[in-house]
Amino acid sequence: MIAQGGGSIVNSSSFAFLGDYGGTGYPAGKGAVNSLTLAIAAELKEHRVRANVVCPGARTRLSTGPDYVAHIADLNRRGLLDDVSMQGSLDVAPPDYAAPTYVFLASDLARHLTGQIVAASGGFVGKFPKVTPELIGYRDHHDSPPWTVTELSAMFDGRAD
C-alpha cells in the first residue's frame, strides 16, 4: 500500500472487546485486533494508509437460540448490558445492515478517517471514543517520594485533595 501511495485497511472486531461477555480469550483477541488497527493507523498515516475497525452486530448462528437469549438476559441482570444494549443484542439485524459501513470506510469518502473503532449494528452506527487516562493524581518524581498505598486508595476513592 505504501508503494501504491496509500490505501485502506478495514478490520473486523466485536463489541466483546469491551470484556463484558465472550469469556476471556475472545475479548482479548478482539482487543488485539483493535490495538493492531490503531497501531497501523498511527504508523502508516504519513504514507496515506488508513486503518479502521468495525465492530458489527449481525445475526449469526451464535447470536440466536435459547442459550444466547439466557446469556444476554443474565448480562443485563448483572449490570453488564443496559436495557437498550440488551434489546439490541436480542433483536440483531442481518449482516447486510453492517456491510455499508465497511464499504464506506474502505472508500475515498472516508479518506479523512483513520484509527477509528466503529460500531455498526442494524440501524445503529457509533464511534468508540479514544481511550485516554484520566488524571487522578500527580507529583514530580524528582522531588517527591512514590505514592503510598493509602494515598492511592484515597485517589481512587475520590477523596484525594
Region roles according to the model:
Residues 2, 10-32, 37-46, 55-91, ...:
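Catalytic loop of short-chain dehydrogenase/reductase
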